Amino acid sequence: MATKKAGGSTRNGRDSEAKRLGVKRFGGESVLAGSIIVRQRGTKFHAGSNVGMGKDHTLFATADGKVKFEVKGEKNRKYVSIIAE
């Protein structure tokens, strides 16, 4: 004979894996061409000079230099640029 009444099943108990998004290289850091600067969903940050954008909106350096974050334009967009050294 069971000493405890059977518990019902739950519909919870699952969660998606973290995607490791965010800024990978901060302002003033030196980077090499091809380095990932930001992983993002959508264009939270836009590509400035010497920065390319992948099909998943990842920003990467296209030249060696230092990372620079700036806000500009009428819409106050955030841009990431690489200042060549």
Swiss-Prot record:
One GO term (biological process): translation
Assigned keywords, A-Z: Ribonucleoprotein, Ribosomal protein
SUPFAM superfamilies: Ribosomal L27 protein-like
Region described as Disordered: 1-20
A GO molecular-function descriptor: structural constituent of ribosome
PROSITE patterns: RIBOSOMAL_L27 (PS00831)
Residues forming coiled coils: none
A matching Pfam family: Ribosomal_L27
InterPro entries: Ribosomal_bL27 (IPR001684), Ribosomal_bL27_CS (IPR018261)
Record-level GO cellular component terms: cytosolic large ribosomal subunit
Family of the protein in this entry: Belongs to the bacterial ribosomal protein bL27 family.
PANTHER family: LARGE RIBOSOMAL SUBUNIT PROTEIN BL27M (PTHR15893:SF0), RIBOSOMAL PROTEIN L27 (PTHR15893)
Name this polypeptide is given: Large ribosomal subunit protein bL27
Origin species: Glaesserella parasuis serovar 5 (strain SH0165) (Haemophilus parasuis)
